[in-house]
Amino acid sequence: MNLHQFRFVQEAVRRNLNLTEAAKALHTSQPGVSKAIIELEEELGIEIFARHGKRIKRVTEPGAQVLKSIEVILREVNNLKRIGEQLSLIHI
């Protein structure tokens, strides 16, 4: 489980479940995004997204709960980065 996987899930939802668009927005490949999301699902033991074949159709109910946690985690990571930047300016 890592922050890249969290960002991929978040961006996939932002891009209306279009992994190609999510990959473009994150400057990476669509197969990489797809693989990372599947690996996260396997690690968590749930399906974040309902699929029809290879196409993502919707966020599952457990996926919605995971997404809420992902959003909190990524928001806190950004807060930590901001704190680090502010403190590094003070110590220069």
How does the language model describe each region?
Residues E43-L44, V66-S88:
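Alpha-helical linker/hinge and terminal dimerization helices associated
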